[in-house]
């Protein structure tokens, strides 16, 4: 009796599995980082969740980075307490911070595209500090462009008043960008395999 060897069949390409795993990982990381937050007056907490958004876009690129943050938002919409201060559900997303959550999804995709100038990401260690900084600033601009008008509409205040309230966050967000650029620049060995 001749022995036949079973041939392995890939149902899903290994690159797709890697990207999906990365998206799930960064969705979880964003959820964990959201729990490190400080509630400020006005209903918008200062949190570390933008780090998850930044790294998802930079490391996974525009498609999978955006998908990762979308997954995070969908898990929160489904009721898991993954948003800042343990928030969850449709009511939370329709509240003052909902625009920022939507902005996070768009920002991850935009900053991933700006950084890589393509839908397919290259290794993040190949990116210059200037392109990483530009990408992060573009992502941050998207977050504010979606979040501030949403905040104004939900709170029933003027756009100027909402922008003024959010000005407290700008310095902290710029520090987050500086730290992210530093990690990318200094983490060559650790980050080299993410592409």
What are these regions (language model features)?
Residues 2-9, 18, 25, 32, ...:
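Short helix-perturbing small/polar motifs within transmembrane alpha-helices
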Residues 2-64:
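Hydrophobic transmembrane alpha-helices
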Residues 15-23, 46-53, 65, 92, ...:
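Residue-level signature of transmembrane alpha-helical entry/exit and packing/kink sites
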Residues 22, 26-30, 53, 57, ...:
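Alpha-helical transmembrane segments in multi-pass membrane proteins
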Residues 34-38, 60, 76-80, 84-87, ...:
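Short helix-capping/hinge motifs at transmembrane helix termini and TM-loop junctions
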Residues 36-109:
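Alpha-helical membrane segments and adjacent membrane-interface helices in multi-pass membrane proteins
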Residues 42, 120-195:
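Membrane-embedded alpha-helical hairpins and interfacial helices in multi-pass inner-membrane proteins
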């Amino acid at each position: 009796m001749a022995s036949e060897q079973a041939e392995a069949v890939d149902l899903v390409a290994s690159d797709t599995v890697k990207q999906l795993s990365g998206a799930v990982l960064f969705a979880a990381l964003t959820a964990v980082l959201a729990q490190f937050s400080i509630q400020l007056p006005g209903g918008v907490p200062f949190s570390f969740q933008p780090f998850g958004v930044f790294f998802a876009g930079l490391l996974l690129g525009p498609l999978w980075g955006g998908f990762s943050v979308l997954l995070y938002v969908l898990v929160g919409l489904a009721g898991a307490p993954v948003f800042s201060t343990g928030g969850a559900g449709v009511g939370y997303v329709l509240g003052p911070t909902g625009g920022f959550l939507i902005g996070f999804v768009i920002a991850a995709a935009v900053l991933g595209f700006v950084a890589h100038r393509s839908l397919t990401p290259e290794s993040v260690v190949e990116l210059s500090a200037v392109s990483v900084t530009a990408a992060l600033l573009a992502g941050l601009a998207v977050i504010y462009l979606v979040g501030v008008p949403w905040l104004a509409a939900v709170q029933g205040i003027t756009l100027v008043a909402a922008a003024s309230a959010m000005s407290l966050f700008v310095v902290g967000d710029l520090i987050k960008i500086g730290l992210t650029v530093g990690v990318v620049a200094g983490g060559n060995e650790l980050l080299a395999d993410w592409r």
